[in-house]
Amino acid sequence: MRRRLIALLSLLSVMTLVYLKPADAAEPGAAPAAESNGLRLLEEMQAVITELAETAKPSVVSLFPTNPLGKGRDVAPERVPNAPGSGAGVIITPAGHIITNNHVVGDSAEIEVRLSDRSKLIAQVIGKDPDTDLAVLKVTADRPLPYANFGDSSTVRVGQWVLAVGNPFGLERTVTLGVVSGIGRENVNLSRYENFIQTDASINPGNSGGPLFNLRGEIIGINTAIINFAQGIGFAIPSNMAKQVLQQLLEQGRVVRGWLGVGIQPLTPELARKFGVPEQEGVLVNEVFE
């Protein structure tokens, strides 16, 4: 499918040159042929997108936790929470492992999982990581389940086409198309560790935990939030971060991170002069935690 898409994009470039050719240089009857070729090109590109959607949707599940946000959980004002009791996830192994958002799972004792064939299963929580807003669930089925593979989010580029699939407002496996608007987004007050992919693919309450696919059908992100006072600004956790968290959650049910045990602040020129530090590089240790 990737070779087919490259060929279509190459043809699109040629067709663009045809349309931009001066009118007085065009031969009689050339315009109808160009229009016919252009329409055929668009239809073929559309077929690529629809094929991708049909391939990707079966791995996406709808989640219905009993207590999605948990008791006393604060939600950042920038994040629009899920519709009550709903969210999305994506199956990542044929054995039934599902990755989703931690804020979708919350403190739920059990989570109902609705598969693409409308069958329902109860999921067990394998592990959660609030610092990245990720969680892993496990369902047991009597058959191998359709699943999606992770892609390499380090190769994601701005302008790349992406598909978001989720459960907005309970509308299961809704597909939206967009582009990558930005990468490496930080300081958006959504989680402790932030390195988000920004996209304009439509993401709404209930999309949380659903996958962001590239045109190969690979997961490049886990949709997590939108800006509540803007349109077309959504964020996804990069797949490479998700894979690192996933490995620890599968092995030990939690993520273990190093802790230095000190508080630091930038070493400003004023502080450097005060402490007699000749260099103005580095940081100042201002607190030690026992």
Where are these regions (language model features)?
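Bacterial N-terminal signal peptides that target proteins for export
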Residues: 1-9
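Bacterial N-terminal signal peptides
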Residues: 8-17
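Intrinsically disordered, low-complexity proline-rich regions
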Residues: 16-19, 159
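Sec/Tat signal peptide C-region and signal peptidase I cleavage site
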Residues: 21-24
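Serine-dependent protease modules
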Residues: 26-290
